[in-house]
């Protein structure tokens, strides 16, 4: 406990210095300081999380260790900025055995729900949920214009996901590209027959000077004219023909692969429709696409080893790294649900989920997992998404609502705010977006140690999760719903309610 307190005191000593300089930097109308989201003043309306931490220490409060589950793309476990904060399972050795008998082999830092146990399969690009659902239903409804009797609802769903996935648009692109390729071939056959025209060295600039006539040729020329205009005049004719042929080949391949190629997620070995079936995945939490999860982790617990002003919101917390979000495409409901259960079972009191999607065919699994988190008093923080839309009209999943539409009391939906206290233009909003937090020009660390600034509700969520972890560490008797209510009631009111860590901690001190 003494070393834990020592770490927090050191954090405060470093953090107070930038606070004293904040007014100087802003008065000169220079760019925002890198730690603005952890402080506050006019023009830099952050969360006062640094001040809150120092306030608690001055009041003689002693925190308990706390773990945060980070459900994301994984993280760079070698990165010095976050490595000291990664929870290391004390009884698990990298020996291919389940040493601590928790059902997971070699889960030293957390768990990877995107890979097979032997590591031969690793899901990196999985497509949107709408595309995957279209792919699943295509064998049953291919070519149908009307619903089979008794299948009206599912057929309507099939048509809906086809539209969401852009299948009809892609099929139209296939038809247009096919016509263009035919036009290219027609014109190419004419050029081959012309005397004194060297087709293999002919440039587009030379092509447009040729006197070609005939209805079919003119129609073909009109069809491919846009491609010729877009290309450089020095481009060889035969190269443009090849490019269009390759484009069509790629389109045909992609459409054919919808039926031909299996959904690799089905090869991981679990029952995707049962949450109890969790014996899949592996312990490799680093991998392709880990940049997002690494940055989110640094916003939570970054140590400031590269730049002392670029630190996490609550550095003493320990992270459970849960790789459940692919590099490209939508996360699977089953993986998110399984990751929530893992985090709960392994001691997390706060879970950060900087993820979201437009469709959730197995929403019941996530609801089951959120009920499990609620039962074990775990607070879940979810980013609201970056579509700039009203979630009351078009939701993002998970919604944080039960199947009956009732909000989970242990769930926080977080939008992004700007330094001026406004809602960020990209941030989703709605009556169930409880809080906002800085999500614009937030500094953190990427794999390899690169310091950079990012925007997004994905960044606002860990700001809130870090504050929630701080409160739960210093006030362990407060339940998850009580912390949610506390953060909501003490939020700074303005255009949008912005989380205020100092006000929340002051209120918590009076409460218990």
Model-derived features: positions:
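Bacterial Sec-dependent N-terminal signal peptides
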Residues: 1-26
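Short acidic, glycine-rich surface-loop motifs adjacent to enzyme active sites
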Residues: 27-38, 145-167, 171-174, 181, ...
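Mature extracellular/periplasmic domains of secretome proteins
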Residues: 53-63, 288-290, 311-314, 330-352, ...
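C-terminal subdomain of the subtilisin-like protease fold in secreted/lumenal serine endopeptidases
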Residues: 344-355, 362-364, 376, 409-413, ...
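A cross-family glycoside hydrolase active-site/sugar-binding cleft signature
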Residues: 323, 352-356, 383-384, 415, ...
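Extracellular S/T/G-rich loop segment that most often corresponds to the catalytic His/Ser-adjacent loop
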Residues: 378, 399-473, 477, 481
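Active-site glycine-centered loops adjacent to acidic/histidine catalytic or metal-binding residues
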Residues: 72, 385, 456
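Subtilisin-like serine protease catalytic core
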Residues: 54-68, 73-331, 408-410, 428-432, ...
């Amino acid at each position: 406990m003494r070393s834990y307190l020592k770490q927090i005191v050191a954090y405060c000593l470093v953090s107070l210095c930038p606070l004293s300089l904040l007014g100087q930097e802003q008065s000169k109308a220079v760019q925002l300081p890198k730690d603005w989201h952890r402080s506050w003043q006019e023009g830099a309306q952050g969360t006062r999380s640094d001040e809150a931490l120092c306030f608690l220490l001055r009041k003689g409060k002693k925190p308990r260790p706390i773990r945060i589950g980070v459900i994301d793309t994984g993280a760079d476990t070698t990165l010095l900025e976050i490595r000291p904060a990664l929870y290391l399972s004390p009884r698990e050795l990298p020996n291919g055995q389940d040493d601590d008998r928790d059902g997971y082999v070699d889960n030293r830092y957390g768990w990877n729900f995107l890979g097979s146990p032997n590591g031969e399969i690793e899901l990196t690009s999985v497509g949107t949920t709408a595309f995957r659902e279209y792919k699943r239903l295509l064998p049953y409804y291919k070519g149908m214009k009307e619903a089979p009797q008794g299948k009206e609802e599912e057929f309507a769903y099939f048509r809906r996901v086809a539209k969401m996935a852009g299948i009809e648009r892609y099929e139209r692109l296939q038809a247009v590209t096919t016509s263009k390729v035919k036009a290219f071939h027609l014109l190419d056959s004419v050029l081959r027959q012309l005397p004194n025209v060297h087709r293999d060295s002919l440039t587009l600039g030379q092509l447009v000077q040729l006197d070609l006539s005939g209805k079919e040729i003119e129609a073909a020329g009109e069809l491919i004219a846009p491609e010729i205009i877009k290309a450089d005049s020095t481009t060889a004719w035969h190269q443009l023909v090849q490019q269009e042929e390759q484009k069509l080949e790629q389109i045909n391949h992609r459409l054919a692969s919808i039926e031909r190629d299996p959904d690799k997620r089905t090869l991981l070995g679990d029952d995707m429709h049962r949450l109890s079936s969790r014996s899949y995945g592996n312990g490799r939490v680093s991998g392709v696409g880990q940049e997002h999860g690494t940055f989110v982790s640094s916003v939570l617990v970054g140590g400031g080893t590269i730049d002392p002003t670029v630190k996490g919101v609550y550095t003493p917390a320990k992270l459970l790294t849960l790789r459940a979000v692919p590099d490209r495409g939508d996360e699977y409901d089953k993986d998110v649900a399984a990751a929530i259960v893992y985090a709960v079972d392994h001691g997390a009191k706060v879970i950060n989920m900087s993820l979201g999607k437009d469709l959730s065919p197995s929403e019941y699994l996530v609801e089951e997992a959120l009920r499990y988190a609620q039962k074990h008093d775990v607070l879940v923080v979810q980013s609201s998404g970056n579509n700039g839309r009203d979630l009351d009209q078009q939701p993002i999943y998970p919604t944080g609502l039960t199947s009956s539409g009732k909000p989970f009391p242990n769930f926080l939906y977080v939008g992004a705010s700007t330094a001026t206290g406004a809602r960020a233009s990209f941030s989703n909003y709605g009556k169930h977006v409880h809080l906002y937090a800085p999500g614009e020009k937030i500094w953190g660390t990427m794999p390899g140690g690169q310091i950079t600034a990012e925007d997004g509700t994905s960044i606002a969520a860990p700001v809130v999760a870090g504050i929630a972890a701080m409160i739960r560490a210093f006030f362990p008797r407060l339940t998850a719903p009580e912390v949610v209510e506390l953060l909501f009631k003490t939020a700074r009111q303005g255009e949008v309610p912005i989380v205020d860590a100092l006000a929340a901690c002051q209120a918590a001190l009076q409460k218990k």
